[in-house]
Amino acid sequence: MKRYKVVLLSGDGIGPEISEISITILKKLSKKYGFNLDIKEEYFGGIAYEKHNDPAPKETLDQCKASDAVLLACVGDVKYDTLPRELRPESGLLKLREALNLFANIRPVKIRKSLLDSSSFKKEVIENVDLIVVRELIGGIYFGQPRGEITQTKIKKAFNTMVYDSNEIERITEVAIKIANQRSKKICSVDKSNVLEVSQLWRDTVSLVASKENDLALSNMYVDNAAMQLVKDPGQFDVILTSNLFGDILSDLAAMITGSIGMLPSASLSNSGPGVFEPVHGSAPDIAGKNIANPIAMALSTSMMLKIGLNEIEAADDIEIAIDNVLSKGYRTSDLDNGNCQVLSCSEIGEKIIQEI
């Protein structure tokens, strides 16, 4: 019987609530499909700072490195915003990405037919949307050096560096090509090459790598136009390839196509070693403990972990089917309420999904 080691980072806010549902799902699937899961929970984010004065303790990172996959819920809380930057929960995410060399972030954006009425977009605009954002994750302006703050007399100055080398761009392009070859063989690379030298290198490198592929359709788009096109006609996109900063922004914009950011999973991957699978949404401390959070993005992230991280394809598909069945029966959490459905709590919608497996 196959055995997998999974590290759970339930984190902060609504994290423990949505994690509990995913763990129950995993336990049921492991029995159904005949594999063993060794699930070890570790401190991460704000809770890790409270316990260890570090949002990403060495023990946690070591356990993640030794695992087959990492399942992460969410981190953060406004109460940590006054801490030094390196102690904030969000800094833990950057440390985790660096420690595991997670250079590729994969965010699928797919509209479920039963949720067409829950989106703020018109039905005819989004009904065929099925795209993937491939975002470079450990380069660009979030990691570039030098960075910092300077005080000159009474004037404060802050600066960051947006930097990529051709190797970083090549490897993320290869990930996008691999995904595109399994889909429509169509990639839209997003940059700002009309004003940024780093974006010109991005465009040149992506074009060079893509030119070696047969039957691959590559287009280029400036990021401001890409944002407009995602709202105007999101169905035109299949695989969007972009840098760290632009991907962060565009993927959240694309999230609203689905009706709620509570519907979007993601995977962060390296060339070797474990990936991290997490919902796109934040920790939502304002609703933590109220049992009203949407656990579906976490469940879909669990599905991605099974499919990509553990190669348990049937088990992964089982989650997707269960979620579609629950939604098609009119069950929703409050963030998806369109006035014509049965609103359930976080635990209730989780139980419905578990029953469908």
Curated annotation (Swiss-Prot):
It holds the Pfam family Iso_dh. Its EC number is 1.1.1.85. GO terms for cellular component: cytosol. Its cofactor is Mg(2+); Mn(2+). Signal peptide: none annotated. Binds 1 Mg(2+) or Mn(2+) ion per subunit. Transmembrane segments: none annotated. InterPro entries: IsoCit/isopropylmalate_DH_CS, IsoPropMal-DH-like_dom, Isopropylmalate_DH. Mg(2+) binds at D224, D248, D252. It catalyses: (2R,3S)-3-isopropylmalate + NAD(+) = 4-methyl-2-oxopentanoate + CO2 + NADH. It is an enzyme of class 1 (oxidoreductase). It comes from the Bacteria. One of its GO terms (molecular function) is NAD binding. NAD(+) binds at G282, S283, A284, P285, D286, I287, A288, G289, K290, N291, I292, A293, N294. Its main location: cytoplasm. Substrate binds at R97, R107, R135, D224. It is found in: Cytoplasm. The record marks Y142, K192 as: Important for catalysis. Catalyzes the oxidation of 3-carboxy-2-hydroxy-4-methylpentanoate (3-isopropylmalate) to 3-carboxy-4-methyl-2-oxopentanoate. The product decarboxylates to 4-methyl-2 oxopentanoate. Belongs to the isocitrate and isopropylmalate dehydrogenases family. LeuB type 1 subfamily. Homodimer. This is 3-isopropylmalate dehydrogenase. The gene is leuB.
